[in-house]
């Protein structure tokens, strides 16, 4: 029987969601990749092979792997789900009245799997020969223009939603290029048979309202156990979102402490998990240059309505996290090599590992210095190739959205 809920960062991983490289990545070009938040184009065929290897290695350890294209295709077989998604994606405000009116009947009749591929991979004008003939606006635009842009960052399933203890958040993303990802997750959680009627709550974010300055991405969120949640506040996650999530968790008594981790804002350290991740119950890997600058603020529930009080932590982040887990201290594995090598390996996601169970992680093979230090610390490191998958700045932790994970303490 499948369960729902993520109760630690290193307990036995039972169910996870991923997204394979696909049409969205085939449409990345040197001209558009930066707008779509990729640093480079992928060799898609090799990225697909490497992602398949990643999935296989998780399955060999008993992890159930759910794939986003498959989930979305199955979801869109439900007419109510199809209407939910298209009513929000195919609108005059997004496309213009004439284009929206021309496209909607075409999409309504499309097979579910093809519609799922287009919702992730984008729709170019060249995909619309019949619709284009009916629209003066479309006929005037180049065939390579996108009516609906691709969303290649679906590769990094950690971010658009995140499971925190007995529920999930649907995250309003910082950059507009990623916001359609959250709508897809909302549709899946509402309508897919796996989740329909499931024993979980949606803590926050399942709304069509504008979130203004409140943004959050799952790479910043870690339910570490013992009723504690770490949330990084750097480039992508804002205090406006953190406060609302803390309030929702406290109101439901789902957590007893939320630790906000104020980080420097930089592309290299866009999320907390790019500089800090758990490998075992008491082992973390980290990029000290950034982690040493993190300032922590603990939030505790004050009343049953979810209001909370904030306590500044005037001590290092590692001490705060160890105390929250009732540990005397954390053992640390810093990014390996000299200062040049460490900076390179952090950029290549050397600290962005995903634990399959206590003491077992998946990491990119290219980060040889850091992987060696992890093994010396007693961690089993399962490697996958990272030369293509890492071009969007994300490793094993970024590419996985755990849905069911055991406690570790």
Curated annotation (Swiss-Prot):
What UniProt keywords apply to this chain's record, in alphabetical order?
Answer: Arginine metabolism, Cytoplasm, Hydrolase
Task: Answer yes or no on keyword Transcription regulation.
Answer: no
The EC number(s) attached to this protein equal 3.5.3.6
Reaction(s) the record says it catalyses: L-arginine + H2O = L-citrulline + NH4(+)
Which molecular function term from Gene Ontology is one that the record holds? arginine deiminase activity
Gene Ontology BP terms: arginine catabolic process to ornithine; arginine deiminase pathway
Q: Name the NCBIfam families for this protein.
A: arcA, PRK01388.1
The protein in question is named Arginine deiminase
Q: Which species is this UniProt entry from?
A: Rhizobium etli (strain CIAT 652)
What's the source species' lineage? Answer: Bacteria, Pseudomonadati, Pseudomonadota, Alphaproteobacteria, Hyphomicrobiales
